[in-house]
């Protein structure tokens, strides 16, 4: 768990690296799963993030990370053709959580070569900013109304944009 570049930014403490890595993986898995609330949302976000990881990893000579990310991008773009509105197939929890694991591990293993290394944390966060922001908005909205953050609802950013007529 603690061997990635993302976790290495937590310092020299192996237990802290492990905790940061687990929190990142679980957080991204849930963000992608939460973001799978509208046709094409999760697959589109993962495709964009995977392409971003690919370009950085390829430029830095990280063959395995670039291969994993380009395959993920290709698979999600192929899936997106069937999942765009009106969707003919759906990803479901199994697909969204699987993509969450893949993209979270790819961002952990990504070494953008930025110093100081704590600044390299911004790259995975920027690549996954939309699902992360959507999750934060939905969770805080539910908590503010006294609801469990794990209950379903129409308080995601995508639902708000649809209600406002912006999508």
Residue ranges and their predicted role:
Residues 1-136:
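"…together with the soluble PPM/PP2C metallo-phosphatase catalytic core" -> "…together
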Residues 36, 166-167:
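A helix-boundary/kink motif common to multi-pass secondary transporters
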Residues 137-166:
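Cytosolic, membrane-interface loops and tails of multi-pass inner-membrane proteins
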């Amino acid at each position: 768990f603690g061997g990635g570049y993302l976790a290495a930014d937590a310092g020299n403490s192996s237990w802290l690296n492990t905790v940061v890595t687990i929190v990142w993986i679980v957080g991204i898995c849930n963000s992608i799963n939460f973001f799978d609330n509208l046709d094409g949302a999760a697959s589109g976000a993962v495709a964009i993030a995977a392409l971003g990881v690919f370009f950085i990893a390829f430029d830095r000579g990280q063959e395995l990370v670039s291969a994993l990310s380009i395959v993920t991008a290709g698979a999600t773009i192929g899936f997106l053709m069937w999942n765009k509105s009106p969707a003919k197939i759906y990803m479901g929890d199994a697909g969204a959580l699987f993509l969450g694991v893949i993209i979270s591990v790819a961002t952990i293993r990504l070494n953008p070569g930025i110093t100081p290394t704590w600044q390299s944390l911004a790259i995975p966060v920027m690549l996954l900013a939309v699902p992360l922001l959507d999750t934060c908005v939905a969770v805080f909205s539910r908590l503010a109304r006294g609801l469990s953050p794990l209950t379903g609802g129409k308080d995601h950013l995508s639902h708000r944009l649809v209600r406002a007529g912006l999508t």
